[in-house]
Protein backbone atom coordinates (compact mmCIF):
# COMPACT_ATOMS: atom_id res chain seq x y z
CA UNK A 1 0.00 0.00 0.00
CA UNK A 2 1.18 3.50 -0.85
CA UNK A 3 0.12 6.28 1.53
CA UNK A 4 0.92 9.99 1.51
CA UNK A 5 0.53 12.04 4.72
CA UNK A 6 -0.21 15.74 4.12
CA UNK A 7 0.05 18.01 7.16
CA UNK A 8 1.18 21.39 8.47
CA UNK A 9 3.23 19.85 11.29
CA UNK A 10 5.57 16.88 11.67
CA UNK A 11 7.71 16.04 14.70
CA UNK A 12 10.55 16.50 15.30
CA UNK A 13 10.86 19.07 12.51
CA UNK A 14 7.83 21.33 12.88
CA UNK A 15 5.76 20.98 16.05
CA UNK A 16 3.17 23.07 17.83
CA UNK A 17 0.60 20.51 18.95
CA UNK A 18 -0.14 16.80 19.07
CA UNK A 19 -0.74 16.57 15.32
CA UNK A 20 3.02 16.78 14.81
CA UNK A 21 3.57 13.68 16.95
CA UNK A 22 1.04 11.70 14.91
CA UNK A 23 2.51 12.73 11.56
CA UNK A 24 6.06 12.07 12.75
CA UNK A 25 5.39 8.70 14.41
CA UNK A 26 2.50 6.87 12.74
CA UNK A 27 4.32 6.60 9.37
CA UNK A 28 7.22 4.86 11.13
CA UNK A 29 4.90 2.21 12.56
CA UNK A 30 3.17 1.77 9.20
CA UNK A 31 6.51 1.45 7.40
CA UNK A 32 7.52 -1.33 9.81
CA UNK A 33 4.41 -3.18 8.59
CA UNK A 34 5.62 -2.91 5.00
CA UNK A 35 3.61 0.09 3.77
CA UNK A 36 5.22 2.65 1.46
CA UNK A 37 4.54 5.82 3.45
CA UNK A 38 5.66 9.34 2.59
CA UNK A 39 5.01 12.77 4.11
CA UNK A 40 4.51 16.17 2.49
CA UNK A 41 5.03 19.33 4.55
CA UNK A 42 5.55 23.06 3.93
CA UNK A 43 9.24 23.95 3.65
CA UNK A 44 9.36 26.35 6.60
CA UNK A 45 12.21 28.79 6.97
CA UNK A 46 13.44 27.15 10.16
CA UNK A 47 14.03 23.88 8.25
CA UNK A 48 16.86 25.44 6.25
CA UNK A 49 19.53 23.16 7.71
CA UNK A 50 17.62 19.95 6.96
CA UNK A 51 19.51 17.82 4.39
CA UNK A 52 17.49 17.67 1.17
CA UNK A 53 17.84 17.24 -2.57
CA UNK A 54 19.93 20.01 -4.13
CA UNK A 55 17.41 20.49 -6.91
CA UNK A 56 13.61 20.34 -6.73
CA UNK A 57 12.12 16.95 -7.57
CA UNK A 58 9.05 18.76 -8.91
CA UNK A 59 8.36 22.30 -10.09
CA UNK A 60 4.99 23.67 -11.05
CA UNK A 61 2.30 26.25 -10.53
CA UNK A 62 -0.47 26.58 -7.96
CA UNK A 63 -2.82 29.51 -7.43
CA UNK A 64 -0.80 31.58 -9.96
CA UNK A 65 2.35 30.96 -7.90
CA UNK A 66 5.60 29.16 -8.78
CA UNK A 67 6.21 26.35 -6.28
CA UNK A 68 8.95 23.78 -5.85
CA UNK A 69 9.06 20.46 -4.04
CA UNK A 70 12.27 19.09 -2.55
CA UNK A 71 12.86 15.62 -1.15
CA UNK A 72 14.40 14.83 2.23
CA UNK A 73 14.10 12.10 4.85
CA UNK A 74 12.25 12.14 8.15
CA UNK A 75 15.12 12.37 10.67
CA UNK A 76 16.22 9.00 12.00
CA UNK A 77 14.35 7.06 9.33
CA UNK A 78 14.12 6.24 5.64
CA UNK A 79 10.65 7.81 5.31
CA UNK A 80 10.63 10.12 2.25
CA UNK A 81 9.68 13.68 3.14
CA UNK A 82 8.50 16.13 0.47
CA UNK A 83 8.98 19.83 1.25
CA UNK A 84 6.80 22.42 -0.51
CA UNK A 85 8.92 25.47 -1.17
CA UNK A 86 7.51 28.99 -1.60
CA UNK A 87 8.34 32.36 0.02
CA UNK A 88 5.02 32.18 1.91
CA UNK A 89 6.45 29.38 4.05
CA UNK A 90 9.91 30.89 4.59
CA UNK A 91 9.11 32.02 8.14
CA UNK A 92 10.60 31.11 11.48
CA UNK A 93 7.31 29.85 12.91
CA UNK A 94 4.31 27.89 11.64
CA UNK A 95 1.34 29.97 12.80
CA UNK A 96 0.48 33.50 13.82
CA UNK A 97 0.24 35.19 10.42
CA UNK A 98 -2.67 37.10 8.91
CA UNK A 99 -2.40 35.18 5.63
CA UNK A 100 -2.74 31.68 7.11
CA UNK A 101 -5.83 30.95 5.04
CA UNK A 102 -3.96 31.77 1.85
CA UNK A 103 -0.75 29.97 2.90
CA UNK A 104 -2.39 26.65 3.67
CA UNK A 105 -4.70 26.87 0.67
CA UNK A 106 -1.53 27.27 -1.40
CA UNK A 107 0.04 24.28 0.34
CA UNK A 108 -3.01 22.10 -0.29
CA UNK A 109 -3.30 23.21 -3.91
CA UNK A 110 0.37 22.42 -4.46
CA UNK A 111 -0.12 18.91 -3.09
CA UNK A 112 -3.08 18.48 -5.43
CA UNK A 113 -1.09 19.71 -8.45
CA UNK A 114 1.80 17.42 -7.49
CA UNK A 115 -0.48 14.39 -7.50
CA UNK A 116 -2.48 15.46 -10.56
CA UNK A 117 0.72 15.81 -12.58
CA UNK A 118 2.29 12.51 -11.57
CA UNK A 119 4.67 13.59 -8.83
CA UNK A 120 3.72 10.40 -7.00
CA UNK A 121 0.78 8.02 -7.20
CA UNK A 122 -0.37 7.08 -3.68
CA UNK A 123 -3.42 4.88 -3.20
CA UNK A 124 -4.39 6.78 -0.04
CA UNK A 125 -3.95 10.46 0.80
CA UNK A 126 -4.11 10.95 4.57
CA UNK A 127 -5.00 14.58 5.40
CA UNK A 128 -4.65 16.16 8.83
CA UNK A 129 -6.84 18.93 10.27
CA UNK A 130 -8.13 22.08 8.58
CA UNK A 131 -4.82 22.94 6.90
CA UNK A 132 -5.41 20.12 4.39
CA UNK A 133 -9.21 20.07 4.46
CA UNK A 134 -9.49 21.13 0.80
CA UNK A 135 -7.48 18.18 -0.49
CA UNK A 136 -10.28 15.58 -0.34
CA UNK A 137 -12.39 17.96 -2.44
CA UNK A 138 -9.65 18.26 -5.07
CA UNK A 139 -8.97 14.51 -5.12
CA UNK A 140 -12.50 13.54 -6.15
CA UNK A 141 -11.44 13.12 -9.79
CA UNK A 142 -8.34 11.08 -8.92
CA UNK A 143 -8.01 7.32 -8.25
CA UNK A 144 -6.92 8.16 -4.72
CA UNK A 145 -8.86 7.44 -1.52
CA UNK A 146 -8.75 10.13 1.15
CA UNK A 147 -8.70 9.92 4.94
CA UNK A 148 -9.28 13.09 6.96
CA UNK A 149 -8.15 13.06 10.60
CA UNK A 150 -9.63 15.52 13.10
CA UNK A 151 -7.02 16.31 15.72
CA UNK A 152 -8.87 19.19 17.36
CA UNK A 153 -12.28 20.29 16.12
CA UNK A 154 -11.98 23.59 17.98
CA UNK A 155 -9.47 24.77 15.37
CA UNK A 156 -11.38 24.87 12.07
CA UNK A 157 -9.18 27.35 10.26
CA UNK A 158 -9.99 30.82 8.97
CA UNK A 159 -12.86 31.18 6.49
CA UNK A 160 -11.97 31.30 2.81
CA UNK A 161 -14.26 33.99 1.32
CA UNK A 162 -12.05 34.36 -1.77
CA UNK A 163 -11.97 30.62 -2.49
CA UNK A 164 -13.66 30.86 -5.89
CA UNK A 165 -11.00 33.25 -7.15
CA UNK A 166 -8.45 30.46 -7.16
CA UNK A 167 -10.27 27.16 -7.75
CA UNK A 168 -12.94 25.96 -10.12
CA UNK A 169 -15.47 24.34 -7.77
CA UNK A 170 -18.93 25.46 -6.65
CA UNK A 171 -18.94 27.63 -3.53
CA UNK A 172 -21.56 25.46 -1.82
CA UNK A 173 -19.17 22.51 -1.38
CA UNK A 174 -18.24 23.47 2.18
CA UNK A 175 -14.98 24.95 0.96
CA UNK A 176 -15.57 28.22 2.87
CA UNK A 177 -14.66 26.20 5.99
CA UNK A 178 -11.68 23.91 5.32
CA UNK A 179 -12.61 21.61 8.22
CA UNK A 180 -16.11 21.17 6.80
CA UNK A 181 -14.66 20.50 3.34
CA UNK A 182 -12.46 17.74 4.74
CA UNK A 183 -15.37 16.15 6.58
CA UNK A 184 -17.76 16.26 3.62
CA UNK A 185 -15.46 15.16 0.82
CA UNK A 186 -13.12 12.58 2.39
CA UNK A 187 -13.75 8.87 1.96
CA UNK A 188 -13.20 8.22 5.67
CA UNK A 189 -12.96 10.44 8.75
CA UNK A 190 -11.02 9.59 11.88
CA UNK A 191 -10.73 11.28 15.25
CA UNK A 192 -7.74 10.72 17.50
CA UNK A 193 -9.54 8.65 20.14
CA UNK A 194 -12.76 6.62 20.30
CA UNK A 195 -14.26 8.79 23.05
CA UNK A 196 -13.48 12.01 21.18
CA UNK A 197 -15.14 10.59 18.05
CA UNK A 198 -18.32 10.16 20.09
CA UNK A 199 -18.00 13.49 21.89
CA UNK A 200 -17.74 15.61 18.74
CA UNK A 201 -21.14 14.29 17.67
CA UNK A 202 -22.70 16.09 20.66
CA UNK A 203 -23.52 19.81 21.05
CA UNK A 204 -21.17 20.08 24.05
CA UNK A 205 -18.05 19.16 22.07
CA UNK A 206 -19.16 19.46 18.44
CA UNK A 207 -18.10 23.09 17.89
CA UNK A 208 -21.31 23.68 15.87
CA UNK A 209 -20.47 20.78 13.55
CA UNK A 210 -22.08 18.05 15.66
CA UNK A 211 -25.06 17.74 13.33
CA UNK A 212 -22.79 17.34 10.32
CA UNK A 213 -20.68 14.75 12.14
CA UNK A 214 -23.67 12.76 13.38
CA UNK A 215 -24.73 12.46 9.77
CA UNK A 216 -21.48 10.77 8.74
CA UNK A 217 -22.42 7.43 10.29
CA UNK A 218 -19.73 4.76 9.90
CA UNK A 219 -17.48 7.11 7.94
CA UNK A 220 -16.36 8.54 11.29
CA UNK A 221 -14.27 6.32 13.57
CA UNK A 222 -11.99 6.95 16.53
CA UNK A 223 -8.47 5.51 16.50
CA UNK A 224 -6.39 6.13 19.60
CA UNK A 225 -2.98 7.71 19.12
CA UNK A 226 0.13 6.15 20.55
CA UNK A 227 3.54 7.46 21.58
CA UNK A 228 7.03 6.71 20.36
CA UNK A 229 8.05 4.28 23.08
CA UNK A 230 11.59 3.98 21.72
CA UNK A 231 12.27 7.68 22.07
CA UNK A 232 10.25 7.98 25.29
CA UNK A 233 11.90 5.38 27.50
CA UNK A 234 12.88 5.99 31.14
CA UNK A 235 15.51 3.26 30.81
CA UNK A 236 17.49 5.33 28.29
CA UNK A 237 16.30 8.93 28.72
CA UNK A 238 19.46 11.05 28.94
CA UNK A 239 17.62 13.86 30.74
CA UNK A 240 16.96 11.81 33.88
CA UNK A 241 19.27 11.74 36.88
CA UNK A 242 18.77 7.98 37.15
CA UNK A 243 17.43 5.61 34.51
CA UNK A 244 15.01 2.86 35.47
CA UNK A 245 12.44 0.41 34.16
CA UNK A 246 9.78 -1.86 35.62
CA UNK A 247 12.45 -4.12 37.14
CA UNK A 248 14.25 -1.23 38.83
CA UNK A 249 11.38 1.10 39.74
CA UNK A 250 12.83 1.66 43.23
CA UNK A 251 15.53 3.80 41.60
CA UNK A 252 12.94 6.27 40.32
CA UNK A 253 12.76 8.10 43.66
CA UNK A 254 16.23 9.53 42.98
CA UNK A 255 14.74 11.52 40.11
CA UNK A 256 12.06 12.85 42.44
CA UNK A 257 14.58 13.96 45.04
CA UNK A 258 16.70 15.62 42.34
CA UNK A 259 13.62 17.44 41.03
CA UNK A 260 12.77 18.67 44.53
CA UNK A 261 16.31 20.00 44.94
CA UNK A 262 16.22 21.63 41.49
CA UNK A 263 13.11 23.63 42.39
CA UNK A 264 13.94 24.42 46.00
CA UNK A 265 11.30 22.19 47.59
CA UNK A 266 11.65 20.24 50.81
CA UNK A 267 13.51 17.09 49.78
CA UNK A 268 11.37 14.20 50.96
CA UNK A 269 10.26 10.95 49.36
CA UNK A 270 7.08 11.13 51.47
CA UNK A 271 5.83 14.41 50.00
CA UNK A 272 3.46 13.98 47.05
CA UNK A 273 5.09 15.71 44.07
CA UNK A 274 2.55 16.75 41.42
CA UNK A 275 3.67 17.63 37.89
CA UNK A 276 2.10 19.55 35.00
CA UNK A 277 3.59 19.72 31.50
CA UNK A 278 1.18 21.47 29.17
CA UNK A 279 0.23 24.33 26.93
CA UNK A 280 -1.45 26.84 29.22
CA UNK A 281 -4.70 27.39 27.35
CA UNK A 282 -8.40 27.30 28.18
CA UNK A 283 -8.85 23.76 26.86
CA UNK A 284 -6.55 22.32 29.53
CA UNK A 285 -8.85 23.06 32.46
CA UNK A 286 -6.49 25.01 34.66
CA UNK A 287 -9.21 27.50 35.57
CA UNK A 288 -10.38 24.78 37.97
CA UNK A 289 -7.25 25.38 40.06
CA UNK A 290 -7.83 29.10 40.62
CA UNK A 291 -10.32 28.65 43.53
CA UNK A 292 -8.31 25.79 45.06
CA UNK A 293 -4.87 27.16 45.89
CA UNK A 294 -5.45 28.20 49.50
CA UNK A 295 -7.62 25.24 50.43
CA UNK A 296 -5.34 22.70 48.75
CA UNK A 297 -2.08 24.14 50.09
CA UNK A 298 -3.39 24.53 53.66
CA UNK A 299 -4.90 21.03 53.90
CA UNK A 300 -2.35 19.05 51.91
CA UNK A 301 1.36 18.39 51.93
CA UNK A 302 1.63 18.24 48.14
CA UNK A 303 4.22 20.06 46.06
CA UNK A 304 3.51 21.25 42.49
CA UNK A 305 5.86 21.95 39.58
CA UNK A 306 4.41 23.42 36.37
CA UNK A 307 6.07 23.64 32.96
CA UNK A 308 4.33 25.38 30.08
CA UNK A 309 3.42 28.60 28.35
CA UNK A 310 0.45 30.04 26.52
CA UNK A 311 -2.44 32.28 27.49
CA UNK A 312 -1.26 35.22 29.66
CA UNK A 313 -4.17 34.61 32.05
CA UNK A 314 -2.98 31.10 32.88
CA UNK A 315 0.65 32.17 33.05
CA UNK A 316 -0.42 34.79 35.60
CA UNK A 317 -2.46 32.16 37.47
CA UNK A 318 0.56 29.91 38.00
CA UNK A 319 3.04 32.75 38.51
CA UNK A 320 0.94 34.28 41.28
CA UNK A 321 0.41 30.88 42.93
CA UNK A 322 4.17 30.26 42.90
CA UNK A 323 4.77 33.68 44.48
CA UNK A 324 2.15 32.98 47.16
CA UNK A 325 3.53 29.51 48.00
CA UNK A 326 7.22 29.65 46.98
CA UNK A 327 8.14 26.54 48.98
CA UNK A 328 5.34 24.43 47.51
CA UNK A 329 4.67 25.62 43.93
CA UNK A 330 7.14 26.36 41.12
CA UNK A 331 6.21 27.54 37.62
CA UNK A 332 8.54 27.47 34.61
CA UNK A 333 6.61 29.49 32.03
CA UNK A 334 8.30 28.20 28.90
CA UNK A 335 8.77 24.86 27.20
CA UNK A 336 11.96 22.99 27.95
CA UNK A 337 12.39 19.36 26.91
CA UNK A 338 14.95 18.36 29.60
CA UNK A 339 12.76 19.80 32.36
CA UNK A 340 9.68 18.14 30.88
CA UNK A 341 11.39 14.76 30.92
CA UNK A 342 12.59 15.28 34.49
CA UNK A 343 9.00 16.02 35.54
CA UNK A 344 7.72 12.88 33.83
CA UNK A 345 10.51 10.88 35.45
CA UNK A 346 10.28 12.39 38.93
CA UNK A 347 6.70 13.46 39.70
CA UNK A 348 4.49 11.09 41.67
CA UNK A 349 1.25 12.42 40.18
CA UNK A 350 0.69 13.97 36.74
CA UNK A 351 -2.24 16.41 36.48
CA UNK A 352 -4.42 16.92 33.35
CA UNK A 353 -7.84 18.36 34.34
CA UNK A 354 -8.77 19.11 30.72
CA UNK A 355 -12.04 20.71 29.71
CA UNK A 356 -11.72 18.56 26.58
CA UNK A 357 -8.85 16.49 25.23
CA UNK A 358 -9.05 14.91 21.76
CA UNK A 359 -6.36 12.39 22.65
CA UNK A 360 -3.61 13.79 24.83
CA UNK A 361 -0.01 12.72 24.90
CA UNK A 362 1.04 13.90 28.36
CA UNK A 363 -0.91 11.24 30.23
CA UNK A 364 0.61 8.49 28.06
CA UNK A 365 4.15 9.72 28.64
CA UNK A 366 3.36 9.94 32.36
CA UNK A 367 2.13 6.33 32.38
CA UNK A 368 5.24 5.24 30.50
CA UNK A 369 7.45 6.99 33.08
CA UNK A 370 5.58 5.85 36.19
CA UNK A 371 3.95 9.20 37.06
CA UNK A 372 0.38 8.27 38.00
CA UNK A 373 -2.08 10.43 36.02
CA UNK A 374 -4.98 12.34 37.53
CA UNK A 375 -7.24 13.43 34.67
CA UNK A 376 -10.72 14.49 33.79
CA UNK A 377 -12.76 11.76 32.11
CA UNK A 378 -12.94 13.14 28.59
CA UNK A 379 -11.64 12.31 25.11
CA UNK A 380 -8.45 10.31 24.93
CA UNK A 381 -7.93 10.67 28.67
CA UNK A 382 -10.95 8.42 29.20
CA UNK A 383 -9.49 5.88 26.75
CA UNK A 384 -6.07 5.62 28.41
CA UNK A 385 -6.53 6.29 32.14
CA UNK A 386 -8.70 3.94 34.18
CA UNK A 387 -9.76 4.53 37.75
CA UNK A 388 -7.74 2.62 40.31
CA UNK A 389 -9.61 0.01 42.29
CA UNK A 390 -7.73 -1.21 45.38
CA UNK A 391 -10.08 -4.18 45.72
CA UNK A 392 -9.31 -5.87 42.40
CA UNK A 393 -5.92 -4.29 41.61
CA UNK A 394 -7.17 -2.74 38.38
CA UNK A 395 -6.79 0.74 36.97
CA UNK A 396 -3.78 2.98 36.47
CA UNK A 397 -4.81 6.42 37.69
CA UNK A 398 -7.42 8.82 39.03
CA UNK A 399 -10.34 10.36 37.12
CA UNK A 400 -13.05 12.88 37.87
CA UNK A 401 -16.07 13.45 35.66
CA UNK A 402 -17.94 16.69 36.40
CA UNK A 403 -16.01 19.82 35.40
CA UNK A 404 -15.98 21.39 38.83
CA UNK A 405 -13.21 22.61 41.23
CA UNK A 406 -14.65 20.63 44.15
CA UNK A 407 -14.47 17.40 42.16
CA UNK A 408 -10.85 18.05 41.25
CA UNK A 409 -9.92 18.87 44.85
CA UNK A 410 -11.61 15.72 46.14
CA UNK A 411 -9.61 13.62 43.67
CA UNK A 412 -6.35 15.34 44.64
CA UNK A 413 -7.05 14.41 48.27
CA UNK A 414 -7.87 10.85 47.24
CA UNK A 415 -4.64 10.52 45.30
CA UNK A 416 -2.60 11.88 48.19
CA UNK A 417 -4.22 9.37 50.53
CA UNK A 418 -3.43 6.49 48.14
CA UNK A 419 0.16 7.72 47.90
CA UNK A 420 0.65 6.95 51.59
CA UNK A 421 0.41 3.25 50.80
CA UNK A 422 3.75 2.79 49.07
CA UNK A 423 3.34 -0.82 47.95
CA UNK A 424 -0.05 -0.08 46.45
CA UNK A 425 1.25 3.05 44.72
CA UNK A 426 4.12 1.05 43.26
CA UNK A 427 1.70 -1.46 41.78
CA UNK A 428 -0.31 1.44 40.34
CA UNK A 429 2.84 2.77 38.69
CA UNK A 430 3.74 -0.64 37.29
CA UNK A 431 0.33 -1.11 35.69
CA UNK A 432 0.84 2.15 33.82
CA UNK A 433 4.40 1.36 32.79
CA UNK A 434 3.48 -2.11 31.53
CA UNK A 435 0.68 -0.90 29.24
CA UNK A 436 1.27 -1.01 25.48
CA UNK A 437 1.22 2.68 24.56
CA UNK A 438 3.10 2.30 21.28
CA UNK A 439 1.80 3.06 17.81
CA UNK A 440 1.52 -0.65 17.00
CA UNK A 441 -2.22 -1.04 17.63
CA UNK A 442 -3.06 2.29 15.98
CA UNK A 443 -0.99 1.41 12.91
CA UNK A 444 -2.85 -1.87 12.46
CA UNK A 445 -6.20 -0.07 12.67
CA UNK A 446 -5.14 2.52 10.11
CA UNK A 447 -3.72 -0.15 7.81
CA UNK A 448 -7.04 -2.00 7.95
CA UNK A 449 -8.86 1.25 7.14
CA UNK A 450 -6.57 1.97 4.19
CA UNK A 451 -7.03 -1.58 2.90
CA UNK A 452 -10.82 -1.31 3.04
CA UNK A 453 -10.72 1.99 1.13
CA UNK A 454 -8.36 0.69 -1.55
CA UNK A 455 -10.67 -2.27 -2.10
CA UNK A 456 -13.31 0.24 -3.19
CA UNK A 457 -11.05 1.51 -5.97
CA UNK A 458 -11.55 -1.79 -7.79
UniProtKB/Swiss-Prot annotation:
It catalyses: [(1->4)-alpha-D-glucosyl](n) + ADP-alpha-D-glucose = [(1->4)-alpha-D-glucosyl](n+1) + ADP + H(+). Its EC number is 2.4.1.21. Gene3D superfamilies: Glycogen Phosphorylase B. Keywords: Glycogen biosynthesis, Glycosyltransferase, Transferase. GO terms for biological process: glycogen biosynthetic process. The keyword Metal-binding does not apply. GO terms for molecular function: alpha-1,4-glucan glucosyltransferase (ADP-glucose donor) activity; alpha-1,4-glucan glucosyltransferase (UDP-glucose donor) activity. It is an enzyme of class 2 (transferase). Pathway: Glycan biosynthesis; glycogen biosynthesis. ADP-alpha-D-glucose binds at residue 15. InterPro entries: Glyco_trans_1 (IPR001296), GS/SS (IPR011835), Starch_synth_cat_dom (IPR013534). It comes from the Bacteria. PANTHER family: ALPHA AMYLASE DOMAIN-CONTAINING PROTEIN, GRANULE-BOUND STARCH SYNTHASE 1, CHLOROPLASTIC/AMYLOPLASTIC. Synthesizes alpha-1,4-glucan chains using ADP-glucose. Belongs to the glycosyltransferase 1 family. Bacterial/plant glycogen synthase subfamily. This is Glycogen synthase. The gene is glgA.
Amino acid sequence: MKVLFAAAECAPLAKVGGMADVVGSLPLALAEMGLDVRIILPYYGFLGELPKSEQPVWTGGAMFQQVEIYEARLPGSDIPLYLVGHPAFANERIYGFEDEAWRFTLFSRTVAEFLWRGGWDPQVLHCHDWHTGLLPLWMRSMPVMTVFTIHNLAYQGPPLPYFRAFVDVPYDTGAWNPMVAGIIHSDAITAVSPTYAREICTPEYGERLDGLLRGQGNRLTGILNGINTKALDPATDKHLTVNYDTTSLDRRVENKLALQREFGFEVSADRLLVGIVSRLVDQKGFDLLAPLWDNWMHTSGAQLVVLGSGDPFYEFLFRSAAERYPDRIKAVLSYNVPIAQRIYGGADLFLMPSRFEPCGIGQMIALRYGAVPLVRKTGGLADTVFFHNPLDEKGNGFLFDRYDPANLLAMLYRAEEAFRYKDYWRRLQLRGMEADLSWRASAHQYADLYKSLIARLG
